[in-house]
Amino acid sequence: MARYAATVTSQHPAADTFSYLATFTNTADWDPGVIAAEQLDSGPVRPGTRFRLVVPFLGRRMALTYQVVTLVPGREIVLAASSRLLRAADRILVDPAGDGATVSYQADVRLRGPLALLDTLLRPGFRAIGQRATAGLAHALATPWVSHQAPQS
């Protein structure tokens, strides 16, 4: 299994930060490893809400459908995805910090089937992907949001 964990600071209030991150389609705005993202279910984000992300994988594009498995409003969201090639899980925690927030992000990827034998080889590449995503997230959370990114109240 490959794991990447990071902590970043947000200039935005914790509630707005959480809303922005829980709307997982926003990953396409800050994670350079996400080519496209869409919410598959209508309505607010809740347990069971699904998001399709298109990511590069082994030189091709792969669609992953993430589903919200845990949601503690304003505090924590856990999403999981599974394909025939891999399993992924992302856990996001948001804590108030003054006028802003602290975000702890953990992403795990585990290869499946015959590829599982290569799991340890995934770690260095996943670390580099995580570092680029963290830089993008830190930039997004330090920047005033434009109207299409702003959380919906």
Locations of the language-model features?
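Hydrophobic ligand-binding cavity/cleft-lining segments
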Residues: 1-41, 46, 153
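Short, surface-exposed coil-to-beta transition loops
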Residues: 3-5, 61-65, 87-91
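Preference for bulky hydrophobic residues occupying beta-strand positions
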Residues: 6-8, 53-55, 79, 92, ...
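Structural motif
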Residues: 11, 71-73, 97-99
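Glycine-rich portal/gate segments that line the openings of hydrophobic small-molecule binding cavities
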Residues: 38-85, 102, 132-151
